[in-house]
A protein has these predicted regions:
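Positively charged n-region of N-terminal signal peptides that target proteins for export
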Residues: 1-4
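Aromatic-lined carbohydrate-binding/catalytic grooves of carbohydrate-active enzymes
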Residues: 109
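Bacterial N-terminal signal peptides
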Residues: 7-15
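Conserved metal-phosphate-binding beta-hairpin within the catalytic cores
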Residues: 227
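Segments that shape or occlude catalytic/ligand-binding pockets
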Residues: 105
């Protein structure tokens, strides 16, 4: 009976939304760590924000953020995202960026890992020992949408971990030679030839890649939606502050 009770307590701890377990005000903490809400910066007002981890529409299937619904970034990183929005608007005023994830507290990262421990998603979630780019406010998950908020077809959904969601096939490195538009274009066109995504989805995905690279943000090879700076993680940890809350 004792073991059964302990098991129930453990399961409840895993399934309970993080915000229900803490009194932390994530918004206040983000500001304390000098991060900025992108929609409050000039040029970022019309970027749409729908944080997937503030819903159950994610691979975890749980609301991990609860009260956190704004997209926070390090100020210089936010300016690059806004630059991408400006580039996109210049190409097509009927389109906008739609942000799915931004800065993520390390406590949420660790909670995510506990939720997926022992599942098929375990390898896709860092354990939060040192933190990834989201945990430093220098990564963005996003797509392109119409001004009405309808996402364009990218050939695979957010948090899809199949080959259809990839943008590059070889082991990813942060050097310029391996992360350029030609490499990504050839790979994405190859997904069409393999029958994994449609031609229209490839065009949409390449538009996102082109816009983001022009703003000096680069996609992570396994996730078409994830963009980051061209810096090794060691340098990120050296220069940035971990969102240790």
């Amino acid at each position: 009976m004792k073991h059964f009770t302990l098991l129930i307590i453990a399961l409840l701890a895993i399934s309970t939304p993080l915000a229900a377990q803490t009194s932390e005000d994530f918004d206040a903490k983000m500001r304390e760590y000098k991060l900025v809400d992108i929609q409050t910066i000039e040029g970022g007002e019309d970027i749409i924000v729908e944080l997937k981890y503030s819903t159950t529409d994610n691979f975890v299937g749980k609301d991990m953020y609860c009260e956190l619904e704004k997209a926070y970034f390090a100020p210089d990183f936010a300016r690059k995202v806004i630059r991408a929005q400006q580039i996109l608007r210049q190409r097509n005023p009927q389109l906008t960026l739609l942000i799915y994830d931004a800065a993520r507290p390390i406590s949420v990262q660790r909670h995510m890992r506990r939720v997926v421990e022992g599942t098929k998603f375990q390898d896709f979630v860092a354990d939060g020992t040192k933190g990834g780019r989201h945990n430093y406010g220098v990564a963005v998950d996003l797509t392109i949408a119409t001004n009405q908020g309808e996402p364009l077809d990218m050939g695979a959904g957010f948090d899809d971990f199949t080959d259809a969601a990839t943008v590059k096939g070889t082991s990813d490195t942060n050097d310029q030679a391996n992360r350029n538009l030609k490499v990504y274009t050839e790979y994405v066109n190859g997904l069409v030839k393999r029958g994994l995504i449609s031609r229209q989805a490839a065009n949409n995905r390449l538009l996102l890649i082109e816009v983001m690279i022009e703003a000096q943000l680069y996609p992570y090879r396994r996730e078409w939606w994830h963009y980051e700076e061209l810096l090794p993680m060691s340098e990120v940890r050296e220069k940035r502050r971990l969102l240790d809350f």
